[in-house]
Amino acid sequence: MAHPKRKISKTRRDKRRTHYKATVAQIATCPITGEAHLYHRAYWHEGKMYYRGQVVIDKQTAVA
């Protein structure tokens, strides 16, 4: 199994880790429904799936 030849200092380790950061999710508000959702994602609202302000799927319950 491989082992490091030299000890990595805390400073060097931390400099490498500066690129790993948490990002805030970008949230949009639909102009039609007023629902908050993630950008570039479809979302459900009152039994309908919306994407870019248009109804993609209208979920109708079948009556037997």
From Swiss-Prot:
The keyword Ribosomal protein applies. GO terms for biological process: translation. GO terms for molecular function: structural constituent of ribosome. One of its GO terms (cellular component) is large ribosomal subunit. InterPro entries: Ribosomal_bL32, Ribosomal_bL32_bact, Ribosomal_zn-bd. Coiled coil: none annotated. The keyword Ribosomal protein applies. Belongs to the bacterial ribosomal protein bL32 family. This is Large ribosomal subunit protein bL32. It comes from Flavobacterium psychrophilum (strain ATCC 49511 / DSM 21280 / CIP 103535 / JIP02/86). The lineage of its organism: Bacteria, Pseudomonadati, Bacteroidota, Flavobacteriia, Flavobacteriales.
